[in-house]
Amino acid sequence: MASTAVQLLGFLLSFLGMVGTLITTILPHWRRTAHVGTNILTAVSYLKGLWMECVWHSTGIYQCQIYRSLLALPQDLQAARALMVISCLLSGIACACAVIGMKCTRCAKGTPAKTTFAILGGTLFILAGLLCMVAVSWTTNDVVQNFYNPLLPSGMKFEIGQALYLGFISSSLSLIGGTLLCLSCQDEAPYRPYQAPPRATTTTANTAPAYQPPAAYKDNRAPSVTSATHSGYRLNDYV
């Protein structure tokens, strides 16, 4: 029962991490900067994500533009794209494997493959969390270095966006959930199919042979009236 509860907790945390990873990948709030004008109506906020960059006006208007050229993007952005996409794919595969391997499901019930699927799902969740952690950590380091670079003008400096914080939380949930899924399968005994005990067989190899009297005593019977003489000797003894 405790192992089942640990599996459910691990799957729930991993599933939340997968959802957070998807949202982090889509949101444009990876880098943000704010330029406030002389009037509150002229306040503008710039946002940059993996797939688009947006401009938010104080009037509530969003204007987003998708990146047109892939080769024109910086290398850190291209690497973050690849890492986050792979992390999302691994999270989806891990979710399917974990559903099959959990004890509360009927898929592959009573087979050793069920434990294998649970361990595989936990391992993939851990790998997905690591990839997401690397992507958001790399981007955060790049943002911090550029922010404290005195050679860059203030208009080109960005701050850490909300999507990076969400990425850290999501990757942590995936790592914790995947670890719980793997640990919940360690205490289980290996599956062994039931084997009926062998039946007792009767062997005649050690039984004693039937007793047979010697041939000399075959005719050693009590004398009858017709075959015995008056002296008590049998007539057959003289034949």
UniProtKB/Swiss-Prot annotation:
Gene3D superfamilies with a match to the protein in the record: 1.20.140.150
GO BP term (any one): bicellular tight junction assembly
Annotated TM spans: 8-28, 82-102, 116-136, 163-183
Superkingdom field: Eukaryota
PROSITE patterns: CLAUDIN
A Pfam family: PMP22_Claudin
Xref: InterPro entries: Claudin, Claudin_CS, PMP22/EMP/MP20/Claudin
Sequence ranges on the Extracellular membrane side: 29-81, 137-162
Compositional bias (Low complexity): 196-216
Tissue expression per record: Liver, kidney. Also found in ear.
Disulfide-bonded cysteines: none
Record family assignment: Belongs to the claudin family.
Entry function: Plays a major role in tight junction-specific obliteration of the intercellular space, through calcium-independent cell-adhesion activity.
Disease: Deafness, autosomal recessive, 29: A form of non-syndromic sensorineural hearing loss. Sensorineural deafness results from damage to the neural receptors of the inner ear, the nerve pathways to the brain, or the area of the brain that receives sound information.
Protein's UniProt name: Claudin-14
Biological source species: Homo sapiens (Human)
